[in-house]
Amino acid sequence: MNKITNFLILSAVLFFSLIESANAARLKDIASIRGVRENQLIGYGIVVGLKGTGDGKNEFMSKSMVRMLDKLGMKLDNVDFASKNVAAVIVTATMPAFGKAGNPIDINVSAIGEASSLQGGTLLQTPLRAANEQVFAVAQGSIVIGGDGKDSHTTAGRIPNGATIERDMTADFSSRKMYRLTLINPDFTTAARSVLTINKELGGHYASAKDSGTIDIITPFAYENRGVELLATIESIEINPDMKARVVVNEKTGTIVIGDKVKISRVAISHGALSVKVGDGKKGAEEKVAVLDSGVSVGELVQALNKLGVSPKDLITILQSIKSAGALHGELEVL
C-alpha cells in the first residue's frame, strides 16, 4: 500500500513539474540586459540610374546633385540640374549591439521627393549617423524591391548588406561589478521568481529586485572578470513568468486573444435571441441558450458561444457588456 501511495505522489510531482517546465521561459526571452541594445541609424542619400521615374526638376534635388558632384571634384556654378533619373532618399538601418567595424548590415531606402519608383536604382555612398550625429556606417549599393515591381510599393526598397559598419559599439561587459536586467513585461511576481531562481543558480544572495521590471545582479567572486560567462548562465535560467488576466479583441478583424487566467463571475446576458447565463441557471424557452458554471474562464464562454453560432462581432459586444457589469475579472483591451 505504501509503495502504491509513494508511486502516486511521485507521479503527481512529475506531472506538475512537466506542466511548470512547459510554461517556463528563458530569462533571455523575457528580459534584456541594460546596455545591450540596437541603435538606429539614418542618412540622406541620392539614388541614380532610374528609368525616368526620379524627382525631375526640383530645386532641392538640384542642390543635392551639385553638392555631390562638387565633392567628386566637379565644379558646377549656377547650374540648374534637373533629371528624372535621380531621386532623393532617406536611408535607415539598425546597428546591432556590439556591432564591429567591417560588419555589413541591411538598409532600407525610401524616396522623399516626387520619384514614382526606385526600381533599378543605385544608392550612392551615404554616411549613416546615430542620434549623437556621429557616423557609424556607410551605405551604397543596388536597391532591391520586392514583388514584380508592378503591384508592389516601388518608392521604398532594401539593400541587403548594403552598409558597412565603420565604428565599433564599445561596451565592456567582462569586468563589471554589477549587471541590470529589465523585464520586457514588468510584473512583481515574475521579478520575485526571477530573483529566487537566479540566487539559487548562483548559490548566494546576488540578485535583488528594485521594482516590478528591474533586477540588479552583483557579480559573484567566482565570475570576477568573467562577465560574459555570468550573463550566459543567467540568460539560460528558466522562469515561469506571471501575467495579468487580459482579453484583447480586435473589432476590425474579429480576433479575440484570451489569457488563461481570465474568469467570469455569475452573470446573465440577453443579446438578441441569445441568452447567456453564468452561474445558477437552467435552459428555458429561449431560442439560443448558453448555461455555464460560475467561475468559468472566458475561453470556455467563447467556446460555448461559438457552438451557438455567435458571430465575432456579437462575441466582442458580449465580452464588453460582461466587463461593464464587473463580472469579467481581468483587463479588456479593444484594438
Curated annotation (Swiss-Prot):
InterPro entries membership: Flag_FlgI
Lineage: superkingdom: Bacteria
Alphabetically ordered keywords of this record: Bacterial flagellum, Periplasm, Signal
Biological processes annotated in GO: bacterial-type flagellum-dependent cell motility
Family: Belongs to the FlgI family.
Lineage: Bacteria, Pseudomonadati, Bdellovibrionota, Bdellovibrionia, Bdellovibrionales
Signal peptide: 1-24
Name assigned to this protein: Flagellar P-ring protein
GO CC annotation, single: bacterial-type flagellum basal body, distal rod, P ring
UniProt subcellular location: Periplasm; Bacterial flagellum basal body
